Amino acid sequence: MAGLSRGSARALLAALLASTLLALLVSPARGRGGRDHGDWDEASRLPPLPPREDAARVARFVTHVSDWGALATISTLEAVRGRPFADVLSLSDGPPGAGSGVPYFYLSPLQLSVSNLQENPYATLTMTLAQTNFCKKHGFDPQSPLCVHIMLSGTVTKVNETEMDIAKHSLFIRHPEMKTWPSSHNWFFAKLNITNIWVLDYFGGPKIVTPEEYYNVTVQ
């Protein structure tokens, strides 16, 4: 009987541990950006997509709900000098519900993209709703234009002292882990100065939006 009791206790403990591990695996990660430092889509909190005919508003929407994007620069590495070089970077244009449209970054000189930007500040940033639950929920492939993505081109520069607090608040509220990154990496705040915008949200090719149209959108 004692052996049976010990066996039952072990079985119960194993079941409890298994259920706890499963809960950890399926629960949304915290501190990855988005509302409440979780996912924008948790509990259906992703705001509705603006009308597709309003390309400027769609562009602002994608920028605001994006926690990361792919930044393409021109490589300075000898092996691939002069070739396109893309890297994934975390970003934020402001606290949830209060986006400015300006993509801010937290960068280090140790990053290859930063070395490229020091020689040539021109870059193109791509952001897509594939990083949210929008495309999966509607059955859209990430390459489909219905799975909205945008391309912003311009120059990446360090933010000045007057903009430092805005960039810091915008990034740290969506990416709190950044606060713990090693200071020895000499992190600094930067932004994309947008000169050209393309919106791909439907079949027929990209729509062109001017920076003026983009920044004139009132985010609600």
From Swiss-Prot:
Transmembrane segments: none annotated. GO terms for cellular component: azurophil granule lumen; endosome; extracellular exosome; extracellular region; extracellular space; transcription regulator complex. Its main location: secreted. Homodimer. Interacts with IGF2R; the interaction is dependent on glycosylation. GO terms for molecular function: transcription corepressor activity. Pfam families: CREG_beta-barrel (PF13883). It is found in: Secreted. GO terms for biological process: autophagy; endocytosis; lysosomal lumen acidification; regulation of transcription by RNA polymerase II. N-glycosylated. Belongs to the CREG family. This is Protein CREG1.
